[in-house]
Every structure is written in structure tokens, then in C-alpha cells.
Design a protein with these regions (language model features):
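Juxtamembrane linker/hinge segments adjacent to transmembrane helices in membrane proteins
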Residues: 1-71, 652-664, 695-702
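Acidic, S/T/G-rich, low-cysteine, solvent-exposed domains in lumenal/extracellular/periplasmic regions
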Residues: 119-122, 187, 201-225, 232, ...
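Membrane-embedded catalytic interface detector for glycan/lipid assembly enzymes
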Residues: 370, 506-508, 516-523, 528-683, ...
Length: 702
């Protein structure tokens, strides 16, 4: 038997008081005046025996009453882990693992699941005694900063009060790993885990990273699992928002794909999906979803402004709100700075005319220089660089660095370009080299034609009104460099001999277009064909555009801020809640990538240098957190077995008094009520016996 208040057991000494009183009464002499003969006659031996028996019974009852009362106040239990006879003498180290992921924001008839878990944790704190210590781990933050133990119940309670549903997801196993690290540093004999979670399916552990914890999770460790699932939850979520368009222009449509999933166990009709651009609703679609069904819905929206554009898709409210929006952003360029380097100024004439056509007159800001001046210019100031020629170029390394850092390049031969110089340029850039020059420059006797065109490439989007068009009219090609992509790129327009007329290549973050015939009339009549102007415009817009993460960064995960090629002393990050972070940088880090760690909220993070927005990063919730399927007890037991847990596991019902249930699980069933009841019954019996004994004593005395 274990006593929760063993100090009260010193009260057992009080049981000696009735005995001492009884012994004292035996020594007390009572004078009775009567004659010996009269006494002998009146003496009733049987009555004397009865009186003495009742007195012994009274003595026993009084001793028992005192013993029972002392035991009741000492709070005895039937079972427990006794250390030196009493469990409460040993100090306890406890770790509270509270699931604060947004699946715990579900509301039932007792309030939100998270608020119920917080209330239970604060109730459990009341069981802690002087010298006990505890730590609080949030599932959403289990991969973040270190958590320390505290002996202050007030501090822990404040931390619990501050918990709000998080957009971050997390694995319970990661929290367990951190809790094990904490317990391994504790010298206290009693060690406990409290896991307060809905035990969502798929969020317990990754089977590939399970650890072995038997050295810490030994027989003395107790795990209390409090499960808050049980309600049938109605939830739909947006799992993905994909941008299908890759070239963005003002007043032009942008196509999106929205993936919506019905996580519920019942079908839902007429699910409305709204598309917002800069917080303005611009499109809606609807769909019917069966239980567990996902659908990809296409939405098209016209962009009416330039710069970074905030985009999100939204569905109507359900029982889990945090997965009802999905964010992304696009960049619509305006006044794109480009620079053109040529061997001969006239070689870029048709390209310039195409870029300054009436519709696009204000789109490009063009600088034109000689090819031998490449090394004198800061290419980082330009969104795209056009190289027409190769004869006077001596800065291929600089062009390569520009492309690696994300710049867009278009390279084409010029009127003076020969095979050797073109091969040298492309080889130094790490691109495929041409094998030969085909045809005769200026000759129009042998004509070469396009064989095929990849009309699915972004440069052809919105060019043709006929969506079923599969081929473009080929210009007459008089001369071109025979070049195969060699597996390093993608041929956009292919010649009849299988070589690439126009191809796309990548150097890390940069895009490169190779046009293998000069854009002048002595090489081809391409510049006077109708496809030339839109293709050149789309190509430069495509090269100037930047790859977006498309919202694949999940809340809580770090993301990179690319400042390569920029001289930046300070960055400002405007978070989705409009709070601001400032990041000071050393000038020598101008070519670095800054890792940003405060991505706890979903939405778009704006990156600024001064007042200029240089990037926008979209952060979204993990779709795995939207599931409304939950683990069974057996799943939890199997997990603990896999990590070699040797202690005791208790499943507690959240409907009961959690604090009392833990005391019962920790120390056994308390018997103080039973002891108190028996003491009261014996007190009543003692009263009856005492009255009867008094009566008998009077009769004997007569």
C-alpha cells in the first residue's frame, strides 16, 4: 500500500491516547461505603464481566477510529511504484507534448480540441509538488529550438495559455525524440510523458527514421495518452495551386490549376472555389466531390497590374479553416531593362523593331552596345542580355556567371560570325557546340525549312487564336549552324536534319536561348515572317521571368532569399500578418543566399531592399494536416514497441477528470473515502456501545 501524504502517518501515535486513558482509569480508586456482607450479596459477577468486555470493545473502537482517520488523511492507495515505502517522496520530471497543429482547431460540444488539451494540461499541473519539474513541447515546433525543464508551475501555465493553433505540421515522433532528450538529462526517479493529441493518421512517425529509446524509456517511465479524436469531422482542403502560365503580361490571362480534396466521409455538392488576385475575387468554379475525392479545377484570370501579384484560391468555411486557402504569387514585368551586344549594329535591327512594336513599346527598356564592351557593364542591372555575334566577344565567363545567377540570355550568330568563334563561345559557356555551318550566307538557291515546332512551349502561349494549330509556317533558311542539343537542352524549333534552330538550355538558375541562324535577311527571311515579332517578344519575356516556388514551401520550413548578384546591406521581410523583419547583411555576402526561418504563417512573404520588392515567397499549409482519419490504440502501442518503450502506457478518457485519472494511474485507487466511511460507522457504533456500557456500569454500582 502507498500513501500520498505519508507525513500524516505520524498521527498514528494518537492511537495510544485511548489506551493511556484506559490504563489511567484502572489505577483510579473509587470509594464505596457499604458493608462487606451487603456488597457480597449485591455483587453480580456476570454484569461485571459484561461491563469489562464493553470497556475493551470501546477501547478497540476508539483506537480503530483514530487509526482509520489518520489513514484517511494519509491518502492510501492500493498499488503504486513505492520508493522507500512512499511514492510521493520521489521527485517527478514530466514532459507535456501538446498537439497544436491546426487539426486540433476542430470544435465539438466542449469547445475546440486544443483548448480542451490546454485545460487538461493545466489541471495536471496541480498534481505537481515542490521540486517536481516539467517541460512543454509543441508538436508544430518539435524541430525548432531547444526546450528546457522548469520547476515553476506559473511559467509553464503561462506557456500553455499562450498556445494557439499553428499552421505548421509536425510528427509526434519528433516531439517524443525531443522529450527523450530532456528526460535523459533528468536525475529524478519518476519520469512521465503526457501526450495530448488527436493522433491524426500519418502524423505519428516516419517509419524510416524511428529511433531506439530503451535506455531512457525504461520501466520507471509512464506515458499518458489523452486522445481528442472521436468526432466525425467535415473538412475540405485546397492541396495545390499551380500556375500553368509561364509568361506574364499585363491585361493577359493567367491559367491556374486548383486541387481540391474532400477529406470527409460524405459527398459534397457544389463546392465553390474562388480565385483572388491582389485580394480581388476575379473568378469562381464549382465542383461536386465524393467522399475522399480530389479534383483538379482550372481557373483563368486576367492580370490588370504589373509587379508582384498576390494570388490565392479559397473555398468556403468548414470545420478546419486553415486549409481553405492556398497561396502563390506571380511577377508581371513592366519596363524590363535589357541590353543588346552586337558585332555589327545593323545585326540587331529586326530584333529591336520586334521589341518596340506598338503593343509592347513600353515593355522593354533597351540598351545597345558593341560586343567588345560586355566586360565593362554590370549585367546584374538587366533582366535579359542578347548576344548577336561572337567575333569580338572576350567575356564569356561573365556571361556564364550572369546566367548561373538567374539572368536570361539569348545568343545568336551575327553577320560576321564564323564557325570557330561560335564554337568557342558556346564551348566556354558550357553549351553544345555546332558541328558545321549549313548552306550559304546570302544565297537563296538552297532553302532549308522547319521540321517541327514544340507549340507547348511557353513562348507560343496565346500566339495563335487557333488552339488546334500543330505547326507554324517555316521561313526560308539560307544558312544556319547545325547544332544538336546533346541532351543538355530542349529543342523548341527543329530543322529537317534534326538539328535545333531554336533551343532552350539551363545553367543552374538561368535560362539560355540559342538561335542558330542570324536574325538578318542574308541568313533567312525569318524577320519578315508574321511569327517573328511575337516569338521574339515572348522569348525575351520568358527569359526575363523568374522561376517561382509555386507555394511548395510549407509553413515552418526555411526558405532561401536569393540575393546573388546584388549589393545588399539590409533586407526587409514583410510577413503575411504585415509584421516586419529586418536582416542585416555584410557587403561581402552580396553573392549569397539568405536562409529565412520565421515562416510560421501561411501567405506571401515580401522581400524588399529599401522600398523595392525584389521577391515574393509563398508559404502554405501541409495537406497531410487536413486528414480527418485517426489512429487506434493499437497503432500507438505498436509505435511504442518499435521504439522499445519499456515503461507503462495509460490511455486516459478526456471525458473524465484527467487530474484524478492520472493520480489513479500513477499511484493506484485511493482508499481515503473508504477509511473515512468506516471510521464514521465505527464512531456511531462506539457511541451506542458507550451508552450501553454506561447503563451497565450504573446497574453494577447500585
Amino acid at each position: 500500500m502507498t500513501f500520498l501524504n505519508p507525513a500524516v502517518l505520524f498521527g498514528l501515535l494518537a492511537a495510544s491516547i485511548p489506551i493511556l486513558i484506559h490504563l489511567f482509569n484502572l489505577r483510579k480508586l473509587k470509594k464505596i461505603e457499604f458493608s462487606t456482607l451487603a456488597f457480597l450479596k449485591e455483587l453480580q459477577k456476570n454484569k461485571i464481566r459484561k461491563v469489562k468486555l464493553k470497556q475493551w470493545i470501546l477501547l478497540a473502537l476508539r483506537v480503530l477510529i483514530i487509526l482509520l482517520l489518520v489513514f484517511a488523511f494519509a491518502r492510501p492507495t492500493l498499488k503504486g511504484l513505492a520508493i522507500g515505502g512512499t511514492t510521493s517522496a520521489a521527485k517527478t520530471t514530466a514532459v507535456f507534448i501538446i498537439d497544436d497543429t491546426f487539426s486540433m482547431s476542430v470544435i465539438d460540444n466542449q469547445g475546440s480540441l486544443l483548448n480542451q488539451a490546454k485545460a487538461a494540461a493545466k489541471s495536471l499541473l496541480k498534481n505537481f509538488q515542490e521540486g517536481d519539474e516539467a517541460a512543454l513541447i509543441l508538436v508544430s515546433q518539435s524541430n525548432e529550438s531547444e526546450v528546457g525543464l522548469s520547476k515553476s508551475k506559473v511559467d509553464i501555465q503561462k506557456s500553455i495559455d499562450a498556445i494557439e493553433p499553428s499552421y505548421q505540421s509536425g510528427m509526434l515522433h519528433n516531439s517524443m525524440t525531443k522529450a527523450v532528450q530532456i528526460l535523459s538529462q533528468s536525475k529524478n526517479l519518476n519520469k512521465e510523458f503526457y501526450i495530448l493529441s488527436d493522433f491524426q493518421s500519418g502524423r505519428l512517425a516516419d517509419e524510416k527514421i524511428l529511433s531506439e529509446f530503451s535506455q531512457v524509456l525504461d520501466e520507471r517511465v509512464r506515458v499518458y495518452a489523452i486522445n481528442y479524436s472521436g468526432k466525425e469531422v467535415y473538412n475540405l482542403g485546397i492541396d495545390d495551386l499551380k500556375i500553368n502560365t509561364q509568361i506574364f503580361e499585363k491585361e493577359k490571362p493567367v491559367n491556374f490549376s486548383v486541387t481540391v480534396t474532400n477529406y470527409s466521409t460524405r459527398s459534397v455538392d457544389n463546392v465553390i472555389v474562388s480565385q483572388f488576385v491582389n485580394n480581388e475575387r476575379i473568378a469562381q468554379v464549382s465542383a461536386n466531390l465524393g467522399a475522399g475525392e480530389s479534383k483538379v479545377l482550372n481557373i483563368e484570370a486576367t492580370v490588370k497590374s504589373t509587379g508582384f501579384i498576390d494570388v490565392f484560391a479559397e473555398i468556403e468555411d468548414d470545420e478546419i479553416l486553415q486549409d481553405n486557402r492556398r497561396f502563390t504569387s506571380i511577377f508581371v514585368p513592366d519596363n524590363i531593362p535589357i541590353i543588346i551586344f552586337t558585332d555589327e549594329p545593323a545585326d540587331s535591327r529586326f530584333v529591336e523593331l520586334a521589341l518596340t512594336a506598338l503593343e509592347n513599346r513600353n515593355t522593354f527598356v533597351i540598351t545597345k552596345k558593341n560586343l567588345n564592351e560586355v566586360s565593362a557593364y554590370d549585367l546584374k542591372r538587366y533582366e535579359a542580355v542578347l548576344i548577336i555575334g561572337s567575333q569580338n566577344l572576350n567575356a564569356s565567363a561573365k556571361l556564364k556567371e550572369y546566367s548561373i545567377n538567374g539572368g536570361g540570355l539569348l545568343i545568336a550568330p551575327g553577320s560576321k560570325t564564323d564557325l570557330a568563334s561560335y564554337q568557342k563561345l558556346l564551348s566556354e559557356m558550357g553549351l553544345p557546340s555546332p558541328s558545321s555551318l549549313v548552306g550559304k550566307i546570302g544565297g537563296q538557291t538552297n532553302l532549308f525549312l522547319f521540321e517541327s515546332t514544340d507549340l507547348n512551349h511557353p513562348v507560343f502561349q496565346d500566339i495563335f487564336t487557333n488552339k488546334e494549330k500543330t505547326k507554324i509556317e517555316s521561313p526560308d533558311i539560307f544558312s544556319y549552324f547545325r547544332l544538336n542539343t546533346q541532351g543538355k537542352g530542349q529543342s523548341i524549333i527543329t530543322m529537317q536534319d534534326g538539328s535545333s534552330f531554336l533551343g532552350e538550355y539551363r545553367l543552374k538558375n538561368g535560362r539560355i536561348f540559342l538561335l542558330n541562324s542570324a536574325p538578318i535577311l542574308t541568313w533567312n527571311n525569318f524577320p519578315i515572317k508574321g511569327i517573328f515579332v511575337p516569338l521574339i517578344n515572348k522569348s525575351i519575356l520568358y527569359l526575363a521571368s523568374k522561376d517561382k516556388n509555386e507555394g511548395n514551401i510549407l509553413a515552418g520550413n526555411d526558405f532561401d532569399i536569393d540575393i546573388r548578384g546584388r549589393s545588399v546591406s539590409q533586407l526587409k521581410v514583410i510577413r503575411p500578418d504585415n509584421t516586419e523583419d529586418f536582416i542585416s547583411l555584410d557587403q561581402k555576402d552580396g553573392n549569397a543566399v539568405v536562409k529565412y526561418k520565421k515562416s510560421h504563417l501561411t501567405g506571401n512573404y515580401k522581400i524588399l531592399t529599401g522600398s523595392k520588392v525584389i521577391d515574393e515567397i509563398s508559404v502554405n499549409a501541409d495537406p497531410l494536416e487536413s486528414k480527418v482519419q485517426y489512429l487506434e490504440k493499437q497503432d500507438i502501442e505498436n509505435y511504442l514497441n518499435k521504439i522499445n518503450f519499456k515503461g507503462k502506457l495509460f490511455f486516459l478518457n478526456r471525458e473524465e477528470n484527467i487530474s484524478d485519472a492520472v493520480v489513479k494511474a500513477r499511484f493506484g485507487s485511493e482508499l481515503w473515502k473508504h477509511f473515512l466511511f468506516i471510521a464514521l460507522v465505527l464512531a456511531f457504533v462506539e457511541m451506542l456501545v458507550a451508552r450501553n456500557a454506561k447503563k451497565g456500569l450504573v446497574e453494577v454500582s447500585k
